Amino acid sequence: MNALLLAINSKYIHTNLAVRYLKEYSRQQGIEGVDFVEYTINQHLPDIIDEVYRLRPQVLLLSCYIWNVDMMLDFAADYKQICPETLIVAGGPEVSYSSRQILEENPAIDMILSGEGEKPFVQLMQHLNGQRAIEDVRSLSYRCCGDIVENPWEEEIDLAELPFAYMDLSDLQHKIVYFESIRGCPFRCSYCLSSIIKTVRYMPLEQACAYLQIFLDAKVPQVKFVDRTFNCKKEHAMGIWKYLVEHDNGVTNFHFELTAHLIDEEMIAFLSTVRQGLFQFEIGVQSTNEDTIKEIRRATSTDKLLDICRRIDAAKNIHLHLDLIAGLPHEGLESFGRSFDRVMSIRPQQMQLGFLKILKGSYMAQMAESYGMIWSKKAPFQVYRSNWISYDEMLVLKAMEDMVETYYNSGLYDCAVKFCLDREVSDFAFFRDFGQFWRAHDFHRKSQSPEEKVTILRDFFLSRRKENTQLLPIFEQLCLYDICRHSRPKKLPDWLSTSKNLEYRSQINAFFDLPETIPTLLPEYSDEPEPKKVQKLAHLQVFSCDPHTLEARDTAILFNYRAPDLLGNAKETLVDIFR
């Protein structure tokens, strides 16, 4: 009997680890005829149905997550009408803790596999092939004689049994691949489903490194570890980090979720030596309100956490993501503002402002009503208000989040935004007010072009205080610098002048004609036939002030777009064309 595993990812660049595990593990256990397909939530449901139908699966397994569960259930309802004979099985975190309810409300779903899927999926296929009784399929919920039967859950798998999931890397050069070396989490944060898993299991270090070497050999751009707390066991974390440093291919970036208070002096010293761009860290702060931290059952010291983050960031070699969650118990708008300002004082490369979601099966779901929380009953189950924060205030934070994403996390306006923030009393107040400014002018009602976005930033900067008018020439040069870092300046706002390049046109042309310019400063363009061609692909910009020091003097910077850093910024060289 053939089976098709269906994944619907949130973005095209994402890949689904679970369906790959099931395919490879079942093959390892002698089950043939299992394959998977991947789509995204942006694709039309009829198109997905069309493609799946053409494959004629006898068994269809849906991989259900918070971002796709509604789409999966809609898919099942429609597909069942077309192919009533197809057995449709749902699995994944969004159905594991409400299997009875899902089966009661969705007649198109025939069965549900709860929890870890590797062993139960093999058992289900053995049952469908006549090799096992249905009562012996662990973690399975199904209908029988007008009732719903829920079999006992399977024991947790030994991670040494896990196969390498990405057997075909040929079509993944422009996608993110995921890797798992740990299951479970030693902490019990009330909002997180990982707190339900009682044990922490580790893949043997030698096995993990052997699997990671496959990614290194293929030079995939990024590997994201899905381990909830990668550094919960120092020997495991350091073993993998040291292996990746010793076998660094100069290309692949590795993303880890860490708990900062477990990072000790030895780890900090080691991390300060790694290649810039090799590692990327995501550290959950969630809140700096001590009452909130205690209520959500986080075991951390905020002061220690932030100090370690600063020390990691000080080396300037690791891309740092810090997270906050809005809507947590005991955290009102003012308290959230204080949390935001404390975290932003580190100036992380990414400031991820999330909103509390009430996940089925979590401790937060048990407590939510006592907190006065109102939340969406459909995915993503986001909180609207609580005893501590109103819906109006959550809307303020939502508008603010859009500004943080657009102007801070995008990295497109780094220097201009930093210039603004350096003149503010509170980063929170800046982004909060920017969000209200954006909505007051109805900018949220239509998409904005890049030149429109930078113009809106300029207008908001001018609206903040009168003295900003005097700073406008510097601010505008920083906007131009931000644009040049990411691409050649083409379509610019009317207020943004590049007159300096006209003034120094002959010097710029002479610079590109120098025989040493391309081989020395732009070797990535050596295959181009002539300097004029290179001049149109790379870029030399003359600024009326130094973008780094803000000193008022003509400054020439060469931008190499074929040697970008991890954030997509062009390689820069300060050049002297003025002699």
How does the language model describe each region?
Residues 56-60, 220, 348-349:
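Proline-aspartate-enriched helix->loop->beta-strand connector
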Residues 160-314:
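Radical SAM [4Fe-4S] cluster-binding motif and immediate context
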Residues 1-3, 137, 141-178, 564, ...:
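N-terminal [4Fe-4S]-dependent radical SAM core
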Residues 234, 246-249, 255-262, 266-430:
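A structural motif corresponding to the C-terminal lobe/cap of the Radical SAM core domain
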Residues 25, 33-153:
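Glycine-rich beta-alpha loop elements in corrinoid/cobalamin-binding modules
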Residues 2-7, 24-55, 59-60, 67-86, ...:
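Internal alpha/beta domain cores that form substrate/cofactor-binding pockets in large enzymes
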